[in-house]
Amino acid sequence: MTSTTEPMTDLHIAQQAVLHPIFDIADAAGIPEEALEQYGRYKAKVDVRKVPDSGRAGRVVLVTAVSPTPAGEGKSTTTVGLADSLNRAFEQEGTGRRSMIALREPSLGPTLGMKGGATGGGYSQVLPMDEINLHFTGDLHAINSANNALCALIDNHIYQGNVLNIDPRRITFKRVLDMNDRALREVVIGLGGPTQGVPRQDGFDITVASEIMAVFCLATDLNDLKSRIGKITFGYNYDRQPLTVAGLGVEGVLTLLLKEAIKPNLVQTLAGTAALVHGGPFANIAHGCNSVIATSLARRRADVVVTEAGFGADLGAEKYMDIKSRFADVAPSAVVIVATIRALKMHGGVPKTELSVSDVAALRRGVTNLARHISNVRQFGLDPVVSINRFTSDSEEELDWLVSWCESQGVSIAIADVWGRGGGGDDLAAKVLAALDAPSDFRHLYELELPVKEKIELIAQKIYGAERVEFSSSALKRIAEISANGWDSLPVCMAKTQYSFSDDASLLGAPSGFVLHVRDLVPKTGAGFIVALTGAVMTMPGLPKQPAALKMDVDAEGNSVGLS
């Protein structure tokens, strides 16, 4: 369809789009029809075992961003717009090269909470937008089911005699729900008498924070998924020895519940670019990257794979480099940092209500946030491309200043209007292709042999800018347990507010000299990392005062209303 800069809602643009049958999208991406399992006309799962090798080994472009603000940055929008622009450039070349997208699935909790949707925006969306944002192909339901089946099996084992000597006080594996529901953070189960189970304190996490989700996204195939599920530590016995899913003997049934969900989902952008949307861990409380299986499949079918990692480069991008890239051959060859004039001014102290007013002084103050993210990406041996997601309120003076600043830092920069013009990222695509052709020296931030405590301190000081890390007594006790159980060599997954480099969400810009507070650690032995909980970050979010859900509805014809 023809793009226009006329203001329209994301949902209206999506509903007016003319979609291609999913078989056509698959054919253009080199995915054979026999590998597809249709979910309607425009969605399909892909059986990767039936996709032949193409000889391609696509290079990965990782899209990340500055520290997020309520003003919005447009990372997913840029990811989609960049892939569309790359495909347009490849078509003009006539060389047969192609790009694909690998994205995370939206979580229903944030969709109904603050975000309202997570499929891009404007003329740079993945479609069908409303179906992807709601139940999609049921992957999160399957992950819910596997997670909660494990919880039920643990409690049943205790009730039926407790042969494993499970200590109910030391069960670390929680139930999950794909919803923001603060009332479920701490609960007591098993009440009502001796036939109702064994009473104990429990709690719920949001599904995207669960270890089942992490295992799902890091597994390389079905067998690896089963192996990782078996390695999950769900608690400890009365002798304080760790207990695993394999010890309980239920890794088989949990894998069975996930055998269809593990197949990547194929959809399309508004411009017809193939998109694999699969898995969805948060980057503030989990590792924040889509599934290894989807990214690896995209690399087999495309020359350039555009993917994203959640929130700012201090969270999702760091975890992509230090966690996901260790488990699979998906290391990025180029990195894009998405920024907006509005977000940088907010980091410079401008309230949201005044962001439309031109203010180069505030931009100068707030650019320190972008500067640190650039520096952080360079620590991994990669020179990032900065993409300015343009808004109509951006003044030419502000844009000129930011371009000049980036050039003074030796940073490639492109101004993109992918929201209003779909593939309006031609300059960004050219800069990214140049970055892919430039020499790079990808490296991890730390060696796995370092003790967990030192890894946390290194991330806090080198990436966040902290002066030191303060560990609670509980955290120190957990570190000793981790070392005693031989888990010291696992990478670290920091759980931290997304809004600041610190653990205080109100400290915007690029704070330094602060103390990072680690209150606890959770070994995720199936996923293969240690979660370090900092500050007041929650693994079960709550809804805001005015949830996005209040604007959502369905009309008499069954069309979605209010998604964005």
Swiss-Prot record:
Species of provenance: Renibacterium salmoninarum (strain ATCC 33209 / DSM 20767 / JCM 11484 / NBRC 15589 / NCIMB 2235)
GO terms classed as biological process: tetrahydrofolate interconversion
Broad class of enzyme this protein falls into: ligase
GO molecular function, one term: ATP binding
Full protein name: Formate--tetrahydrofolate ligase
Reaction catalyzed: (6S)-5,6,7,8-tetrahydrofolate + formate + ATP = (6R)-10-formyltetrahydrofolate + ADP + phosphate
Similarity section: Belongs to the formate--tetrahydrofolate ligase family.
Name of encoding gene: fhs
Keyword Metal-binding: no
PROSITE patterns assigned to the protein according to its UniProt record, in alphabetical order: FTHFS_1, FTHFS_2
InterPro entries xref list: Formate_THF_ligase (IPR000559), Formate_THF_ligase_CS (IPR020628), P-loop_NTPase (IPR027417)
EC number: 6.3.4.3
Top-level taxon of origin: Bacteria
Binding site for ATP: T69, P70, A71, G72, E73, G74, K75, S76
Pfam short name (any one): FTHFS
Chain ranges passing through the membrane: none
Keyword Zinc-finger: no
